[in-house]
Structure formats: structure tokens, C-alpha cells
């Protein structure tokens, strides 16, 4: 009997291992195919860009010829003697060109016409590395000459030393030297090759710099928002630097994260970032934030970089990069007829913050000449007191008295935990969706590691179906209906409420947590997850 049981157990273990291996192989092959398709698409896109450049050049030359022909025609007043030198076909073609106004689609060259002067304007002047592609995460680090101190070497050591061996094979760090002084660039490259020769030869680190022809004339920029001429020039060039770096990095991986050259990182940062992105793979996010400071730790999906770069090119002289990013989100999801709170809720679904921060700013001397910046991320050392999920856009409200600014809105958007003074019978927490949602499951977790006793007790979970009549529900579900149309579907036990939503109740208009009895303790809500049903 023991032998038989052992044989069965061995067989089950073998089958389980085989199925697991088969699933992993299938998943890995699917991922590799996706990356291969992305590379082919981006290679085609680059060929189209080069073709567009040449077409724009020829179009510009042709327009010049047409204008000259018009001028000659006007000066000679259509004299036949002046036109006898042209063949009939040439005269016909020129007549068509001068009589029609062709429509042209605006392109990058409309906003940066100086790029047409040199075909190599969008090709790195210096490029060091073996051109690794097909990774999960590309890290972009722009660096420029600093008058006092460079933090680049320390930043790279922090990033590299906190990577496990297998993680070093799944990412690439691109250092962008935003200078056109070729001697200075070669000096930086020499230092990096000396310090990180192994990482460069392995493909983990790459170094690039733009050609001088990439930059337009930055001497006559309009001063805006009270910034000095020097600061306007600095932020304008910075926008262009970001764009060049993003264009270079786009074809290399699935995600691109923007870093700076004066930061340090937390241990296990790479795995944390990758897992957080995978957790949100079914959501339509645009920016994942792993730091609250400026442009540090902002991660994008590689295909989205096209839209971001195009938008920045349109307004690179107008505003700083972080403002432009917020404008992109506003354009995508905000309704001008709705209020600011509604807009913030919509943007929060595209711009998702991870806490605590994984990157800390350490540079004291800015790349802007003479500027001292004592910027630190206050969330860097904080323990994680809430768990973040992407929830359906909703208007939230509560009858509970909020303690010290720990509001329900911040909790729902993943910014903070909710903390309220002693609940009493009749109190509620309400999540009213902007539009009805098909919900699969729910999870509400109260208390946290600093205040484990501040939990919700004697509290029920209720939902309001969008359809008040005609619901095809079981008698058991029907018995849970309340007078105001809500259905009681669960309750808190040991500070946690979780469960599935009966599909017959979908779509749902609102979730409500109702306090049934007076509580003797305060209440913290540190996790809210209303999971949408997958179609």
C-alpha cells in the first residue's frame, strides 16, 4: 500500500512538474514572440522615419523651386519667351504644382525644422555598448556637465549593486550624456569604461550622446512663468534630452523608467517594479510612479513613448517635463464639463503611485548653474502602511470623522491609508462609481502594522445594482436585499472583508460599508480592491 501511494505521489509530482514546465515554456515563448514583434515594428518605424526625413527634404526643395518658378512667372508676366525653354510636360507639371495647395501631415520636422539640415540629427554621435534588446525594463539616465560635483558613478553603482545576477540579464541602463563638447563626452565615456567595463561589455550599460545638429538655437527663447532666460534654456534643453533618450530606448524593452544621475535605490527595486507592473497588466495605465519627486522613477510602457515624445516636441519650449506629462493625462481622460475632482479621479487611473518610494534624490548641486536643491523623497524610508490597487473611477464619501488628513479619497487613489475616529451605528463608507461596473470580487482590509487594533468591526459590505428591476437572482440573493435597493453581500471578520460578487447583480453602481453597532476603537482602512470582471 505504501509503495502504491508512493508511486501515485511520484506520478502526480511528475505530472504537476510537466504541466508547470509546459505552461512556463508556453508563456516564455509568447513573451519572446511579443518582444520579437515589437522589435520588428520599431525597426520598421525607424525606416519610415528615415524615409519621412528624406521626403520632407525633397518636399522642401520642391517647394523652393515652385516658389522660384512663381516669382519668375510674375516677373515676366507669363511671357512666352521666358517659358519656351521648358518642355510641354514640364510646363504642365509646374502649372499643376503652382495651382494646387497640397495638404501635408505635420511631423516632427514641423516642430524641429532644423533637423532637416542634417540626416544624422537623430543618430547618436557617440554610442557605446552592444545594443541589448528584448529586456523587461530599460532605465534611462540623462547626465550633463555639473560645475561642482558629478553623482553619476555613485548612481550607477547603486543601481547595479542592487541587481541580482538574473536581473542584470533582463534590463539595460542607458546613460545619455547631454553635451555636444565631444572632448568632454569622450572623457565621461573613458571614466565609465574604466569603472564599469564588465557591465558595458555584457550589455547591461550603454552610453550615448546626441549630435550637435539635434539641438535648435536656444538663445532666443521666450521667458515664461517667471523663469529666467537661463532657466528657460535649461528646462527646454532638458525636454529635448528626455525625448532623444526615450526615442533611443523605446525599441529595447517592454517598459522604460526615467531616472536621474543623482539618486540611490532600495534593495530589490527591480523585482518590486517588475512585479508591480505585472500586477497591473490588465489595467490601462500610462505612468507608474516609484518616486514622488519630479521626473524620477516614472515608468512607461514602451509603445506609449511615441505619444509622449510627440507631445513634448510640440511644447518643449513652453513648459517643464512634469507639467507636460500632466497635460497629456488631462487631454486623454478629463472632461472640461466636469469638476477638478472628477478629473483627478480619471487621471489617477492612468497615473498610479507605488509606495514607499524606491528612489531617493541625493544630489545637492543641480545641473542648472548655481542652483542648490535640497530635495528628498519623504516616502523613501517610510514603511508600507497601505496596499495599492487600481479601482474603478468613483466618487467616495463617508459619515466618519477623518483623523489628521488621512482621507478616504487618498486611500482609494492609493496615496494614503484612511483613518477615522470611533465609528458608531449608522456610519457608512460609500464608493459611487462614475459609471456602472461589472465587479468580480472585493477586498477591504482594516488596521495596519503600526495600529493593528484600529479595525472595522460589526460592518457589512453592500452593493447597489445598476438595474433595480428585472434582476434574475436566486431566492438566497433576493433575501439579502435591503429597503433602499442595496444587497448585503458580506461582512468584516477580524478586520477583513472579502468575497465574490454574484454575477447576476452586475453591473454595480455603488459599494457601501455600513457600521451596524458602535465600535470601541478607531478605524483604519489600508487596502481597497474592487476588482473588475474580465470580459
Curated annotation (Swiss-Prot):
Modified positions (Phosphoserine) are: 474
Which residue stretches are annotated as topological domain Lumenal?
A: 28-535
Q: What is the originating organism of this protein?
A: Homo sapiens
Q: What's this protein's function?
A: Glycosyltransferase that catalyze the transfer of GlcNAc from UDP-GlcNAc to the GlcNAcbeta1-2Manalpha1-3 arm of the core structure of N-linked glycans through a beta1-4 linkage and participates in the production of tri- and tetra-antennary N-linked sugar chains. Involved in glucose transport by mediating SLC2A2/GLUT2 glycosylation, thereby controlling cell-surface expression of SLC2A2 in pancreatic beta cells.
According to the record, the protein's activity is controlled as follows:
Inhibited by UDP.
Transmembrane stretches, by residue range?
A: 5-27
Q: Which GO terms describe its molecular function?
A: acetylglucosaminyltransferase activity; alanine-glyoxylate transaminase activity; alpha-1,3-mannosylglycoprotein 4-beta-N-acetylglucosaminyltransferase activity; metal ion binding; protein homodimerization activity
Q: Which PANTHER family match?
A: ALPHA-1,3-MANNOSYL-GLYCOPROTEIN 4-BETA-N-ACETYLGLUCOSAMINYLTRANSFERASE A, N-ACETYLGLUCOSAMINYLTRANSFERASE VI
Please give the cofactor(s) recorded in the UniProt entry for this protein.
a divalent metal cation
The keyword Transmembrane helix is annotated on this UniProt entry: yes
User: Biological process (GO) annotations?
Assistant: glyoxylate metabolic process; N-glycan processing; protein glycosylation; protein N-linked glycosylation; viral protein processing
Q: Which residues form a coiled coil?
A: 28-63
Give the keywords, sorted. Answer: Coiled coil, Glycoprotein, Glycosyltransferase, Golgi apparatus, Membrane, Metal-binding, Phosphoprotein, Secreted, Signal-anchor, Transferase, Transmembrane, Transmembrane helix
Per the UniProt entry, the glycosylated residues are: 77, 458
* Enzyme Commission number(s) of this protein: 2.4.1.145
Q: In which pathway does this enzyme or protein participate?
A: Protein modification; protein glycosylation
Tissues where this protein is expressed? Expressed in pancreas, spleen, thymus, prostate, small intestine, peripheral blood leukocytes and lymph node. Strongly overexpressed in choriocarcinoma cancer cell lines. Down-regulated in pancreatic cancer.
PTM field: N-glycosylated.
Under catalytic activity, the entry for this protein gives:
an N(4)-{beta-D-GlcNAc-(1->2)-alpha-D-Man-(1->3)-[alpha-D-Man-(1->6)]-beta-D-Man-(1->4)-beta-D-GlcNAc-(1->4)-beta-D-GlcNAc}-L-asparaginyl-[protein] + UDP-N-acetyl-alpha-D-glucosamine = an N(4)-{beta-D-GlcNAc-(1->2)-[beta-D-GlcNAc-(1->4)]-alpha-D-Man-(1->3)-[alpha-D-Man-(1->6)]-beta-D-Man-(1->4)-beta-D-GlcNAc-(1->4)-beta-D-GlcNAc}-L-asparaginyl-[protein] + UDP + H(+); N(4)-{beta-D-GlcNAc-(1->2)-alpha-D-Man-(1->3)-[beta-D-GlcNAc-(1->2)-alpha-D-Man-(1->6)]-beta-D-Man-(1->4)-beta-D-GlcNAc-(1->4)-beta-D-GlcNAc}-L-asparaginyl-[protein] + UDP-N-acetyl-alpha-D-glucosamine = N(4)-{beta-D-GlcNAc-(1->2)-[beta-D-GlcNAc-(1->4)]-alpha-D-Man-(1->3)-[beta-D-GlcNAc-(1->2)-alpha-D-Man-(1->6)]-beta-D-Man-(1->4)-beta-D-GlcNAc-(1->4)-beta-D-GlcNAc}-L-asparaginyl-[protein] + UDP + H(+); an N(4)-{beta-D-GlcNAc-(1->2)-alpha-D-Man-(1->3)-[beta-D-GlcNAc-(1->2)-[beta-D-GlcNAc-(1->6)]-alpha-D-Man-(1->6)]-beta-D-Man-(1->4)-beta-D-GlcNAc-(1->4)-beta-D-GlcNAc}-L-asparaginyl-[protein] + UDP-N-acetyl-alpha-D-glucosamine = an N(4)-{beta-D-GlcNAc-(1->2)-[beta-D-GlcNAc-(1->4)]-alpha-D-Man-(1->3)-[beta-D-GlcNAc-(1->2)-[beta-D-GlcNAc-(1->6)]-alpha-D-Man-(1->6)]-beta-D-Man-(1->4)-beta-D-GlcNAc-(1->4)-beta-D-GlcNAc}-L-asparaginyl-[protein] + UDP + H(+); an N(4)-{beta-D-GlcNAc-(1->2)-alpha-D-Man-(1->3)-[beta-D-GlcNAc-(1->2)-alpha-D-Man-(1->6)]-beta-D-Man-(1->4)-beta-D-GlcNAc-(1->4)-[alpha-L-Fuc-(1->6)]-beta-D-GlcNAc}-L-asparaginyl-[protein] + UDP-N-acetyl-alpha-D-glucosamine = N(4)-{beta-D-GlcNAc-(1->2)-[beta-D-GlcNAc-(1->4)]-alpha-D-Man-(1->3)-[beta-D-GlcNAc-(1->2)-alpha-D-Man-(1->6)]-beta-D-Man-(1->4)-beta-D-GlcNAc-(1->4)-[alpha-L-Fuc-(1->6)]-beta-D-GlcNAc}-asparaginyl-[protein] + UDP + H(+)
Hey, which stretches end up on the Cytoplasmic side? 1-4
Assigned GO CC terms: endoplasmic reticulum; endoplasmic reticulum lumen; endoplasmic reticulum-Golgi intermediate compartment; extracellular exosome; Golgi membrane; Golgi stack; peroxisome
- Protein name according to UniProt: Alpha-1,3-mannosyl-glycoprotein 4-beta-N-acetylglucosaminyltransferase A
| Pfam families given in the database record | MGAT4_cons, MGAT4A_C
What does the sequence similarity comment in the record state about its family? Belongs to the glycosyltransferase 54 family.
Would the keyword Glycosyltransferase be found if you checked this record's keyword annotation?
yes
